[in-house]
Amino acid sequence: MLGYADTLSEQEMKNLARFIYLKLGLKEDVSYRPAEGIYVTEDLKIKPDTVIRGLNVPWGLAFLPDGDMLVNEREGRMLRYRNGVLIAEIKGVPKVHAEGQGGLLDIRLHPDYRSNGWIYFSYSGFPEKGGEGWNTSVMRAKLKDNTLVEKQLLFEGTPPLTTNFHFGCKLTFDTKGHLFFGVGERGTMKKVADLSNDWGKVHRLNDDGSIPHDNPYVNTPGARKSIWSYGHRNPQGLVISPFDGTLWESEHGPKGGDELNLIEPGKNYGWPFITFGINYDGKIISPDTAMVGMEQPVTYWVPSFAPCGMTFVTGKRYKSWEGDILMGSLRFHNLVRVKLKDGKVIHREVLLNNIGRMRNVEESPDGFIYVSLEEPGMIIRLVPVQE
């Protein structure tokens, strides 16, 4: 997580870093590639296999039934790959606000995609009715001749804001077809406890965008009916456990205090009233790490590792990791494995050190783990090495 994301654009920060680097007399390494040797972990050996190169901040990743891969680049392109080769840039993608941390974000197929053809994706968009600012939006569409058709805007975060950070927004489905997604607080801080806005919340919709009748705040006057939980800073991972149906969220803290949360309906997860982190300038955000009526994280990290992307391992290919959570790290360029037992963390392991700035982690239908990397942008598959 970048400490000056509300002051400098991402490109300005890259340019500043490059200027400092060259002033120190260091030579740029433009040929960097993640090592493709064998990585030895506690339980097994892994060989990274590069599947796609040449991407520009690959954010979302989805697998079509025919084996093709859809990749969202943050700048606003949705790409279709077959066996690692680009075969089409998808047409009809809505205009996105690709500044700071915004852009074209996650992508997810409906659980019954084979029968209904719905594709869901999130992005930082412009208000449909016009006006200042931009918001986290969720749309669904169908794919015909590599063009998005039958587009339906399901969610548009309100009110729109002009900040360029903390958009969220990962997508996941439960077994009943409910769509969950997290929306960042966009710098609103204490306003995340206000149920009349969408910021700093996990939301739940039916697959057609309607509100489920059993959402926790459907009968609360003035509340946004889609809210499932609140008190979140910037959710960057969201996944339903394939083992017990529980909902898990990874969250960027400030300077310290990244979290892994077990999400339950109607619960307040505390930001910014409780936190294990401090502000980037060293100032205290809150002296408290716990308060009555606010949930504690299942685990947290100090210093922050900037979790991004998260998946459960089913064990099809990695039997010794079955039931574990894998989380990407933007800051430390590695993968974090979290072992759970009865809803509690019993072990953590850092994997694939220095492999690259990790944006997303997904398990494919055939059980392989895929991760997307930035700078350079690529997608790699983790192949278990048999002894």
Which residues does each predicted region cover?
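Electron-transfer interface patches adjacent to heme c in soluble/periplasmic c-type cytochromes
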Residues: L2-K14
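Acidic, Gly/Ser/Thr-rich repeat motifs that build Ca2+-stabilized beta-propeller blades
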Residues: E12-M13, I20-M189, G237-I240, G245-G253, ...
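Blade/loop signatures of beta-propeller domains
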Residues: E28-K47, T147-L148, D208-T220, F273-G293, ...
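Beta-propeller blade signature
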Residues: N135-N146, L195-D208, L262-E264
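Repeat-solenoid scaffold signature
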Residues: A223-L262
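Conserved blade-ending motifs and adjacent loop-strand segments that build the rim/top face
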Residues: H232, K344-P365
